[in-house]
């Protein structure tokens, strides 16, 4: 069906973005000395924050340029189509630019490198190496993996559920039934609310950018306790998500503040775990361990997409809050708060 096809393409999109981004995290760790890695990951987060804000506002921007914001039932509005098309072009262009413009330092002993590459080639060896590295993961990587699970489950919940949850709960304009008598009026109100949600979501990109700027300034001059910063950042995002439960059409302006808090956690998620991890793994295994670490990003999103969000949200509603779409945002907040608590138990001996 069309729904399953859309879900399938969403998974492919998510997987391709994660796979293409992973080598760049390893590249940051490879190119920078240990003392500057926190700084490098934070700068990367700053750039991601700028992109997040621009992307979140693309539907609104192309609407101003004349793209239609409404569509018949079962069709995609022009504003959404053009926003995704622009995003695809920028994504491919930035990947190609980085690939062709970034140099990598050659191995110190090229002959030894080529010899080892020849000995260790083949699919079976690659599978065996990954399996052995998974079994031998450093303890801090396992601990961070649990934190990453809750963090990325929360954000996938936001990406997939924020619009239907917030248009109805905060703006009082849920998506209308196709057989509604005044469908056109209700659909127009829904699309306006959806644009407002998208614009508000752009704030989390701005706040993550501002947070990254502060961290960039701070980490370039002083040592930081990355564990505490990450824990507090996740807690801020958790509060932002749960705050949404108490918003109404009269207080909808506060939605931007909710996303501002969420942006703080987003800025930390994209930098602090990698900065912590890069100090604990051998440089020669940086790529494979960063790849394995990426599994802790992909798995929660797969579980969420396959029904984890719906099941947990229904359990939360049946037990505490009653059945309502906004419960998905509360679930995201609970996940970030759990991640915040678990972060405090990570053993980090050094700072950078």
Where are the model-predicted features located?
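Helix-to-loop junctions at the C-terminal end of transmembrane segments
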Residues: 210-225
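Intracellular juxtamembrane helix-capping segments at the cytosolic ends
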Residues: 19-32, 268-282
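Hydrophobic core of transmembrane alpha-helices in multi-pass small-molecule transporters
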Residues: 1-20, 253-269
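A late C-terminal transmembrane helix in Major Facilitator Superfamily
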Residues: 283-315
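C-terminal ends and interior cores of transmembrane alpha-helices
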Residues: 1, 235-249
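Intracellular loop-helix junctions on the cytosolic face of multi-pass helical membrane proteins
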Residues: 2-11, 17-20, 24-25, 31-157, ...
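Loop-to-transmembrane helix entry
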Residues: 42, 172-206, 254, 327
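Loop-to-transmembrane helix entry/capping segments in MFS-fold secondary transporters
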Residues: 34-44, 194, 281-293
């Amino acid at each position: 069906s069309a729904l399953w096809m859309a879900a399938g393409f969403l998974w492919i999109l998510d997987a391709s973005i994660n796979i293409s981004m992973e080598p760049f995290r390893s590249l940051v760790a490879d190119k920078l000395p240990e003392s500057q890695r926190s700084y490098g990951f934070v700068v990367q987060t700053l750039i991601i924050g700028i992109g997040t804000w621009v992307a979140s506002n693309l539907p609104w921007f192309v609407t101003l340029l004349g793209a239609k914001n409404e569509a018949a039932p079962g069709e995609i509005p022009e504003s959404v189509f053009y926003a995704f098309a622009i995003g695809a072009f920028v994504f491919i262009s930035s990947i190609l630019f980085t690939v062709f413009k970034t140099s990598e330092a050659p191995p110190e002993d090229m002959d030894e490198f080529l010899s080892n590459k020849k000995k260790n080639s083949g699919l079976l060896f690659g599978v065996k190496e990954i399996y052995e590295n998974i079994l031998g993961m450093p303890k801090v990587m396992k601990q961070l993996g649990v934190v990453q699970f809750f963090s990325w489950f929360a954000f996938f919940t936001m990406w997939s559920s924020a619009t239907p949850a917030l248009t109805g709960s905060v703006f009082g304009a849920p998506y209308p039934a196709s057989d509604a008598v005044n469908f056109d009026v209700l659909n127009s109100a829904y699309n306006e609310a959806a644009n407002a949600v998208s614009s508000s979501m752009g704030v989390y990109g701005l706040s993550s950018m501002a947070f990254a700027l502060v961290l960039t300034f701070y980490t370039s001059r002083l040592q930081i306790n990355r564990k505490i910063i990450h824990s507090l950042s996740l807690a801020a995002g958790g509060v932002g998500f749960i705050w949404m439960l108490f918003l109404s059409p009269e207080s909808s302006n506060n939605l931007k503040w909710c996303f501002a808090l969420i942006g703080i956690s987003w800025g930390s998620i994209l930098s602090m775990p990698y900065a912590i991890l890069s100090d604990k793994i051998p440089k020669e295994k940086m790529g494979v361990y960063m790849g394995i670490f990426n599994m802790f990003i992909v798995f929660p999103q797969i579980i969420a997409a396959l029904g984890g969000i719906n099941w947990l949200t229904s359990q939360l509603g049946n037990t505490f809050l009653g059945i309502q779409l906004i419960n998905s945002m509360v679930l995201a907040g609970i996940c970030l708060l759990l991640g915040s608590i678990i972060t405090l138990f990570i053993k980090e001996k050094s700072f950078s």
